[in-house]
Regions:
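Sec-dependent signal peptide recognition
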Residues: 2-10
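Hydrophobic core
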Residues: 9, 13-17
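Secretory pathway targeting signatures of secreted, lumenal, and periplasmic proteins
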Residues: 27-74, 104-110
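Signature of long, low-cysteine stretches enriched in small and polar/charged residues
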Residues: 79-122, 130
């Protein structure tokens, strides 16, 4: 019974924090996602041109998105290489968009991270979510399930 109540409380908190959302245009402008209002825009440093970062003190997660380098490998090849290296990686289709989803540990601070990579024309777009709890990790999936073409 305790587990059921804990699950219910966590679910309510998760959905209440995700209820108020803002739409964010991803790099290159073709796609958008909805992120919780608790994620606040963090201006990029001049050297980080192209990076869009959002941080939160309450959600126990941060995220950034950016266009990858021109010579980024084909997603399927990259998924196979990551899997061969022991990384939890898979190809997934979300709202008609094929993307690579993988879990890594940030080398700089040891934080767990979920990465998403997908093609926007000839450009690869990378999105990384750093998270501190499983609830925050689950929220990344909810956020990515909102991806859609930018119709504005």
């Amino acid at each position: 019974m305790k587990k059921a109540i804990s699950f219910l409380v966590c679910t309510v908190l998760l959905f209440s924090s995700a209820a108020a959302e803002q739409t964010v245009v991803l790099p290159e402008g073709r796609y958008v996602i909805d992120v919780p209002d608790d994620l606040k825009y963090s201006p990029a440093e001049e050297v980080d041109e192209g990076i869009e970062a959002y941080i939160s003190d309450t959600l126990e997660m941060d995220y950034c998105s950016y266009p990858a380098t021109e010579d980024a490998p084909i997603l399927q090849e990259r998924a196979e290489k990551l899997a061969a290296d022991g990384t939890d990686a898979e190809m997934r289709t979300v709202n008609g968009i094929e993307m690579l989803v993988y879990r890594v540990t940030d080398e700089a601070d040891g934080a767990p991270c979920i990465g998403y990579a997908f093609m926007d024309g000839t450009q690869t777009i990378e999105i990384f979510f750093w998270y501190a709890t499983q609830e925050a990790a689950d929220l990344t999936r909810h956020i990515m399930e909102t991806i859609r073409e930018n119709n504005s």
